[in-house]
């Protein structure tokens, strides 16, 4: 990972990665064939490096995009101070932003995003869990129609990335 190798943490966590906010460090994967676009789960542990007031800064994002396009899905974002330090999810043209805040730079967060657009209960089609607690209070709430495809897992949006949110 460019720019991250020189960062010192004082300790090492196996199978982990640290991104520097001073560069465009990210992991990228090209998807050769699509997985399910209607039912999937994304889970991971994340830690905020710092909390900033930058208006458009997404400090951490997991996202997929198509080269040269501004269309993207971001199943998980840390938001900056302009958005209150919340978590957000952007999928299939819909957006959710939690009222719960993630401002603690010393805390690890276990975050799970569940996309199930086949679920008969509309409010269960996108679920977000932070540290085992389902997030149900959102300042922005998307609406998922039955069977709606996400871009996540799609080979049409072949650039799957973790790190800097830059979709071009």
Q: What would you call each of these model-derived segments?
A:
Residues 4-168:
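Extracellular glycan-associated modules
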């Amino acid at each position: 990972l460019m720019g991250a190798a020189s960062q010192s943490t004082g300790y090492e966590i196996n199978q982990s990665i640290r991104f520097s906010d001073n560069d465009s460090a990210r992991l990228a994967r090209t998807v050769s064939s699509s997985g399910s676009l209607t039912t999937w789960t994304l889970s991971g542990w994340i830690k905020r490096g710092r909390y900033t007031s930058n208006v458009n800064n997404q400090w951490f994002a997991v996202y997929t995009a198509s080269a040269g396009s501004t269309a993207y899905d971001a199943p998980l974002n840390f938001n900056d101070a302009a958005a209150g330090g919340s978590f957000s999810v952007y999928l299939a043209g819909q957006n959710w932003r939690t009222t719960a805040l993630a401002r603690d730079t010393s805390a690890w967060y276990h975050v799970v995003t569940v996309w199930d657009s086949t679920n008969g209960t509309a409010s269960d089609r996108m679920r977000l869990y932070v540290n085992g607690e389902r997030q149900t209070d959102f300042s922005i709430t998307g609406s998922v129609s039955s069977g709606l495809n996400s871009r996540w897992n799609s080979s049409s949006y072949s650039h799957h990335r973790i790190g800097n949110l830059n979709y071009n």
